[in-house]
């Protein structure tokens, strides 16, 4: 590693203007990145980490501007450089992998064209050479069948595939510095590992430096030599990664270490807490069941799936030709009252399709889902209405699952009104209580989804799911969009509510790190089938399948605290 810094930020201040006032977003931030080095900026939403990164290449949103300080890249101060000089540095000097693949890919252009555009704009390749290089870059970013994928549009890609396309674009010009802004937040842990391994390989091969922006301290400590911890626009701690992980000095850093699921999953305290929650939840669930003679007569199993299969018709090369794609293949499991069963697997494993069949949103091709002894697909209108009240979902995407035209109050109050629960005043009190439970101020009630962060939106989705006091909650990647601190908070909330109300959870996730804190039983799915089913402890201590071992090995920072 060279003694001369590649990037040197000193006393950087960034402000945003609102109603004539200047609001500081980044305050006196200093950091250094050397050639070939990986430095991670860690912090929760709103800490200023992305603002710091975007100020380097003059891509601050809206009214954001650098008010003081210097940003020296390769000897040149970009804070004082002209627009043309900064644009010349982008791509070949500094590459960017942005966070949100939906808003950073053009929906009307093919993926291959968007990669070629980067290559041609920077004079790397043209024509056939650019087309071939686009395929190679997608392959490097971990995408199978890249030759076919380059001719597809962003809407034909899953979220993870779109993120890989952005990574291919960011690395296209072999930059000296790559700014990776939450580059794997949309990816499964195994793909996350593959992508980050690739970034590591690139760093060592080409001497490319990486500035990694993340909220996961476990991931940051595993991938970076140096950590910069930010809180409310300031750097609160900075130093070698392992030192910060094992001996955090600042209170906020200690909180991050305690909250990261990848690290918490290794602690025995997580296991002990889960055992206590299960014991209490099962007891409460039995009391609730005993109070209802109809329920008590059924069994301890609140949801039973038997030989579930779901096939989708895939359009062929001509309109009259189609093939069957089997998304779920002969899946059976039981969800006991007051417990949590986690379904774990990569994108495309069929876990969300199982969740939709349990919720009655998809009808199985064959097999059945029974809730309290009644088959969900055969419920009449009245039975289906009652079922909706007793089984509630928390969906994966907080952007798509909330109506943008509804205020937060109306969003949470709507299920109460639909099921004719309480007076208007009582419903308002319930909404306030639910917001408090998910750590949101009551002032949020008057706001709309577009005024909230992704994490806040997901907390609203959790509050809405709990509004009807359901017996079963189906959580489809319910915490994947959240910062680690909020993630830990929501997992604790779900545990507390389970113990208090005797709830049963079907927890869909790609992240085994989260599972240990919330689940009692685990089903591991791969390409539509269950490949392993066991208790959480058995899966963590003695996995029988190679695929499960791969998922466990992919948990970021898994062995750092032990080492």
Name every feature range the model reports, one short phrase each.
Residues 165, 170-171, 460, 466:
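ABC ATPase C-loop
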Residues 235-239, 247, 530-534, 542:
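ABC ATPase "signature
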Residues 77, 129-148, 375, 426-443, ...:
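Conserved ABC ATPase "signature" region
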Residues 57, 61, 359:
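Helix-to-loop junction immediately C-terminal to a conserved catalytic motif
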Residues 172-176, 467-471, 487:
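A short, proline-enriched helix->beta-strand linker immediately N-terminal to the Walker B motif
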Residues 65-77, 367-375, 387:
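Conserved ABC transporter NBD signature motif
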Residues 152-157, 161, 448-452, 456:
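Conserved ABC ATPase signature
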Residues 23, 78-95, 113, 121, ...:
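ABC ATPase NBD coupling module
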